Regions:
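Loop/helix patches that line or flank the sugar-binding groove of alpha-linked glycan CAZymes
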Residues: 3-5, 203, 211-214, 220-229, ...
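Active-site-proximal helices and loops of the catalytic beta/alpha 8
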Residues: 69-81, 117-218, 271-286, 356
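Surface-exposed loop/turn positions
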Residues: 150, 384, 403-405
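Short catalytic/ligand-binding loop motif for oxyanion handling, primarily in non-cytosolic enzymes
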Residues: 17-19, 53-54, 90-92, 124-127, ...
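C-terminal beta-strand-rich structural cap/linker in extracellular carbohydrate-active enzymes
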Residues: 395-412
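Acidic/aromatic-lined carbohydrate-recognition and catalytic surfaces
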Residues: 1-159
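Beta-strand-rich binding/interaction modules
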Residues: 372-390
Length: 412
């Protein structure tokens, strides 16, 4: 499968599901919930690091090598490929480091893993950009190129844009894609000091829109490819704010699924659970169904109104919208490899852009603020509404959007 067409679901193993009642999630917990990931529509499972030492051994709190083998096999039987994230502190400073890392990566690829995720921040922090590219070229030569369908991604928040592009240019033979979400963009969908009114007030929304358009357009022009995700962290919502949570989740999903890049869903994004590294909330029972023991990780206290079981039963839920969005992306080639072109580019509140290839042209419109907003769609008069966050609405050259409202139109 074309790696651009995949939908990646990233699991933090420690906080996903606990099967041995020790209060921490484990590899067997991911295997137990693999059908949930399949139901969502993701076809790629990215695991947080589960290794100890140099990458051959499994951390005993996470499980065993046999457990990981069983998970890889079970995922494959559901047509889900498994990508293993290497430890962030894996040294890649010299030839001997790279040889040891290469051996560990080949070991797991030979055992059935589909791909490898490498932390690129440590090498970036050294200040020697050449070291980063030398290391990735060496890993490509020693490992990635030996496995024709190997899915490779760089993980890191500190890689400069130009380096992220260079890492993923095909002719450079380094990585397939780089997770690239600058810190200010990652935080853009997060409330400031718990105030929903500050979510996208003033400059934050404008900056997010400007930078998102820039990275999309320039990434395409320069031949880069990104793993496209928004970290919805630190959001605290009461049951009275349920509608806001749901709409905000849908707006973020719509951007991730229709932008240029391979979409990344971090566990919990699909139900609007934004607290990073807290237990996944499966139901509203004790410990949110995460464990029969005592959780060692702190929950976010919203299990009564944010949990998987509840979201899966409602057609208007964030989970249902994620399912529809993943399916839509998979069925429209323009959303996978099409050109990205901004529309109404000076609008500070609305993301609007087209995705076009030789087969079709789609228009995406998203209000990224908590206030009503207008968007000018001059020249766009006819289109079929394929996806909507609230309710369907015909396309018009001037549209008023409700908070976090969004649409995808197939243009005629």
């Amino acid at each position: 499968m074309d790696p651009r067409a995949r939908a990646v679901y990233r699991v933090d193993v420690r906080s996903f599901f606990d099967t041995d009642a020790d209060g921490l999630g484990d590899i067997n917990g991911v295997a137990a919930k693999i059908d949930y990931i399949k139901e969502l529509g993701a076809d790629t499972l990215m695991l947080s690091p589960v290794f100890s030492g140099e990458g051959f051994m499994i951390d005993t709190e996470a499980g065993t090598a046999d457990d990981l083998d069983a998970l890889i096999d079970k995922a494959a039987s559901r047509m889900i490929g498994t990508v293993l994230e290497m430890r962030a502190d894996m040294p890649l400073n010299d030839a001997s480091d790279i040889d040891r890392a290469s051996a560990a990566m080949r070991y797991w690829l030979d055992r059935g893993a589909m791909g490898i995720a490498v932390n690129t921040d440590a090498l970036t922090a050294s200040g020697d950009k050449r070291a980063l590219h030398r290391a990735m070229c060496a890993l490509n030569r020693n490992v990635f190129s030996l496995y024709p369908d190997c899915f490779t991604v760089g993980i890191g928040k500190n890689v400069p844009f130009e380096d992220a592009v260079q890492l993923t240019r095909t002719e450079n033979r380094e990585l397939l894609m780089q997770l690239y979400t600058p810190a200010h963009m990652a935080e853009a969908f997060s409330p400031a000091s718990g105030s929903l009114g500050a979510l996208f007030g003033g400059g934050d929304a404008k900056r997010f829109k400007h930078d998102a358009d820039y990275y999309q357009v320039q990434g395409e022009l320069k031949g880069g490819w990104f793993l496209n995700g928004i970290s919805l962290t630190q959001g605290q919502f009461s049951s009275q704010q349920e509608l806001t949570r749901r709409l905000r989740s849908k707006a973020a999903c719509l951007y991730v699924m229709t932008g240029r890049g391979t979409p990344l869903i971090r566990q919990g994004d699909e139900i609007g659970l934004y607290a990073e590294n807290t237990p996944m909330q499966w139901n509203n029972s004790r410990a949110a169904g995460f464990t029969l023991g005592t959780p060692r990780l702190k929950g976010d206290g919203s299990l009564s109104h944010i949990n998987v079981e509840d979201d899966m039963t409602h057609m208007d839920s964030a989970f249902s919208f994620y399912k529809r969005s993943i399916a839509l992306r998979r069925s429209h080639s323009a959303l996978i490899g099409g050109e990205y072109a901004p529309v109404d580019s000076e609008n500070p509140r609305v993301m609007a852009y087209t995705r076009s290839d030789g087969a079709e042209s789609l228009l995406v419109v998203i209000n990224i603020t908590d206030r009503a907003a207008k968007v000018a769609l001059t020249g766009y008069k006819k289109g079929e509404c394929l996806l909507f966050t609230n309710s369907p609405k015909p396309i018009a050259e001037s549209m008023k959007l409700q908070p976090y409202e969004g649409f995808v139109y197939r243009l005629r």
